[in-house]
Amino acid sequence: MASDMPLVQLPQRGERINVPLVQSRSEDQRLVTSARQTDKIDADDLVALANQLNSARQLVKGRACDRLKQIADQMEQLHMAARAVLEDAQRDEHLHNVPCNMEKQPGRIYHLYQKQGSMNKYFSMLAPNEWGYQEKKEEYLGSYRLEYDRSWTPVGEMDRKDEEVARLQQLLQREGPVALRGNPNF
């Protein structure tokens, strides 16, 4: 099989080859420094190199410290969030153990009372102003809504909770589950 391309001939051992190089520039425009120039060691160059290394170390340390501080701040926020979750769980457990002579239904508001002169607490559907007795206002401890996940929300926090749920519902409606988008790949 013949080819129109010329064959490359490799030089024989010990044979010198002339290779064209890029035309040299003047001394002040050199791209490559000659070996004679690189062999020279100047004290100022060593000081500059040491300063550059020290500066790089300081930057690396500073960046690492900043990142560690950010992680520590996140850990503190997670710690506070975990503490709030545990406190809410403890409150919810306590409220679930309060006697109630009716079936507790999610979405309803229950009013917590403590009998005067007693440690006994109980839930009622009646708010303090609906009783008609002054004593009930004195026994009143607070009002809570039973959520569908069986957690309790104090009445004072209901608006915030409702806004949070509405935002999550909007997000779910807008984004939707990934599995429901388009055609499934079965």
Curated annotation (Swiss-Prot):
InterPro entries: DUF2452. This is Uncharacterized protein C08B11.9. It comes from Caenorhabditis elegans.
